[in-house]
């Protein structure tokens, strides 16, 4: 699942390579991906890309005609100008850009990529409901406190709730809780001030360090860079890099990993 650090890196890449290019057309191979049936993709034919902005795990492609909001969902992604791809993800949409090509793919068993043509990105319900984004410069300890204080919900689920904090998914929530030394099963309401401080520092440091590490990497390599950087997520059975205990897997609705020694608090 694309999460905010990789989507931010993609946004910066496209800001450098796609802005000021003209969209020749948008060829859609899977009609279900278009979520705004009353706003066809043809509205973008001939439009010039004027900006790229990230909203949580979503991308807003701004043009002089309309906005194209790209919701990557569970397995959507982008491919630039015919670059090599590490997987055979089906291409859902193609956008020739006068001399370049932007392709949108989806590698999932079911289609999760969504495209919306709108005048304002906040017309997309998922964007309008987003909570504060830890990658925003304005995000501070008070914003984190408001997000978790009094919440009788497990931290693992709370961190992934987009209305609470924007941009965090399964992988980075594992990394954040490991860095904060907090149990994924602890409730937000159970955290004391020191634990909330640890969580705040882990959230901001983990995500911002990830953005810095992904910056400049071409889109097709961002997923493998993310996987390689994980310290606990996806590493069940390996030694914890902090305490050397064995990382365990919790296989519920979605598999997630944790260190039973480091993450015993909360």
Locate the predicted segments by residue.
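Gly/Gly-Pro- and Ser/Thr-rich, intrinsically disordered tail segments characteristic of DNA damage-repair
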Residues: 1-113, 121, 249
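Generic detection of long, well-ordered alpha-helical segments
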Residues: 1-4, 134, 138, 192-200
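Basic, nucleic-acid-binding surfaces and adjacent catalytic neighborhoods in DNA/RNA-processing proteins
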Residues: 22-40, 53, 145-266
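Short clusters of hydrophobic/aromatic residues that line enzyme substrate/ligand-binding pockets
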Residues: 44, 127-130, 182, 233
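Phosphate/anion-contacting hairpin/loop surfaces
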Residues: 64-167, 172-179
């Amino acid at each position: 699942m694309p999460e905010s650090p990789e989507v931010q890196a993609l946004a910066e890449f496209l800001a450098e390579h796609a802005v000021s290019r003209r969209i020749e057309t948008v060829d859609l191979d899977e009609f279900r991906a278009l979520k705004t049936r009353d706003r066809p993709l043809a509205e973008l034919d001939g439009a010039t890309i004027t900006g790229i902005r990230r909203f949580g795990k979503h991308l807003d492609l701004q043009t002089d005609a309309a906005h194209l909001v790209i919701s990557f969902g569970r397995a959507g992604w982008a491919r630039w100008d015919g670059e090599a791809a590490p997987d055979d993800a089906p291409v859902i949409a193609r956008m020739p850009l006068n001399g370049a090509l932007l392709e949108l793919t989806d590698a999932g068993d079911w289609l999760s990529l969504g495209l919306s043509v709108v005048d304002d990105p906040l017309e997309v319900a998922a964007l309008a409901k987003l909570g504060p984004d830890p990658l925003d410069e304005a995000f501070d300890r008070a914003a984190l406190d408001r997000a978790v204080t009094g919440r009788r919900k497990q931290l693992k689920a709370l961190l992934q709730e987009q209305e609470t904090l924007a941009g965090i998914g399964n992988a980075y929530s594992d990394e954040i809780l490991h860095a904060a030394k907090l149990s994924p099963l602890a409730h937000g309401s159970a955290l004391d001030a020191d634990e909330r401080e640890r969580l705040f520092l882990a959230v901001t440091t983990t995500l911002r360090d990830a953005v810095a590490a992904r910056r400049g990497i071409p889109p097709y390599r961002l997923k493998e860079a993310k996987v390689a950087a994980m310290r606990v997520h996806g590493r069940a059975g390996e030694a914890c890099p902090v305490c050397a205990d064995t990382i365990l897997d919790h296989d519920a609705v979605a598999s997630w990993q944790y260190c039973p020694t480091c993450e015993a608090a909360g």
